[in-house]
C-alpha cells in the first residue's frame, strides 16, 4: 500500500464506529481512513541516545465510552481518545499492578480484566485531576473466576469464553454465575468468537470450530 504503515508489525485490526480501521502495532497504534495511514506512537521513554522507546500494542478494542483500549505486549492497558488524539493512563481504585493485566474484553458496559490472580469485573470512569486526564478502573475485589485465565472473549450479552491453564476452554454464564467446561486440549493458543461460533486455535495443531448454537 502506498503511504502505508511505516515499517511496523501489525498484531491486531479493529474496525471502529467512526468508520476508520485501527491497527495495533509494535510502535503503538495506526489509523487508516481509506486513503492514508496515520501513526500514533506510544512512547514509554527515551534511551541514553535520545531514541524513543515504543510500547508494542497487542490488542485494540473500542469501548462503549468511545475510547480505544489497548493491551500492551509487556503487560498492562492504556486508552486512546481519538477526539483529542491522546493516550490516557489507566488507574485502579484498588491495589493492582498495571503490568498484571494480561487480557480484557467489554461486555454490557463492564470491562472484564484477566490478571495473574484470575478474571475480574470492573467499571470505568473518566477523571480529571488538574491538567491530568485519566481513566479510573473501579475493580470488583472478588474475582469472577480464579486461576490462570487467558484468551478472553464475549458474545456481548451474558456469556464469557476463555481458556484456563492453556488447556481448558471454559464458558462462564454471567447471569447464573457458573462455569462449564467446553473442551480440554493439549495447548490452547487463541480463542475467537464470531457469529455464534467459537474458533479454538491450538499450538501446532488444527483449528477447531465449535458451534455454540447446538
Task: State where each predicted segment sits.
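Carboxylate-rich, polar loop motifs that coordinate divalent cations or form catalytic acidic clusters
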Residues: 1-214
